[in-house]
């Protein structure tokens, strides 16, 4: 009975030990699985760390390149800002120049209008002088005809005719000058403005020439009248002499 109890006790103990062994083996397997899981987790973590390190390195390299690009961009930005400042200053200078040019153009337009007005006035004076010259030329031609008729009758008029021819040459030269001035009036407004005073001076000279020519014509007509009277007196004396000779 006691032996049976001992066997039972031994069996129970063996069962307990077997259970403990199974439990231990199960725990060992579980621990092995945990160890294996931890190993895989560690390997995965190490791989992730290595990947992170590579990513960090790539990020650092990318950061370096980004910093270089940033430095380049900042430098370009600074240059662009300087260029923009210079452009702005240039624009201000151009705007100031444009404003001055506009003011200058307005002034030139005013001067151009004044020059046109003065030129029109000068043209009017010139046309008036030219008409007077035409009239005087006609009078001079008629005077020349009368002078030539008087020359055929009286040789004393040769000197006066020579003077009249000289005056006629002067008149032709003056007419040529007026023709040249008329061509100059058709030049550009700027040249007209620059030479306006000269044109007015020439117009005044032409008026003085006209006055001189009119006086010359008057003098020639007076001299022609005197010559006719002298010729008439001479003719009367000649007729009287012939009459006296016939009576003798």
Swiss-Prot record:
Cellular localisation: Cytoplasm, Cytoskeleton
Biased composition regions of type Basic and acidic residues, renumbered to the chain: 27-42
Function (record text): Binds to actin filaments in muscle and non-muscle cells. Plays a central role, in association with the troponin complex, in the calcium dependent regulation of vertebrate striated muscle contraction. Smooth muscle contraction is regulated by interaction with caldesmon. In non-muscle cells is implicated in stabilizing cytoskeleton actin filaments.
UniProt-listed Gene3D superfamilies: 1.20.5.170, 1.20.5.370
Domain of life per record: Eukaryota
Free-text note on domains in this protein's UniProt record: The molecule is in a coiled coil structure that is formed by 2 polypeptide chains. The sequence exhibits a prominent seven-residues periodicity.
Subunit details: Homodimer. Heterodimer of an alpha (TPM1, TPM3 or TPM4) and a beta (TPM2) chain. Interacts with TMOD1. Interacts with TNNT1.
Positions carrying Phosphoserine: 51, 179
Residues bearing the modification Phosphothreonine: 72, 216
Family named by the database record: Belongs to the tropomyosin family.
Name of the gene this protein is made from: Tpm3
Protein name, as recorded: Tropomyosin alpha-3 chain
UniProt-listed GO biological process terms: actin filament organization; muscle contraction
Segments forming a coiled coil: 4-240
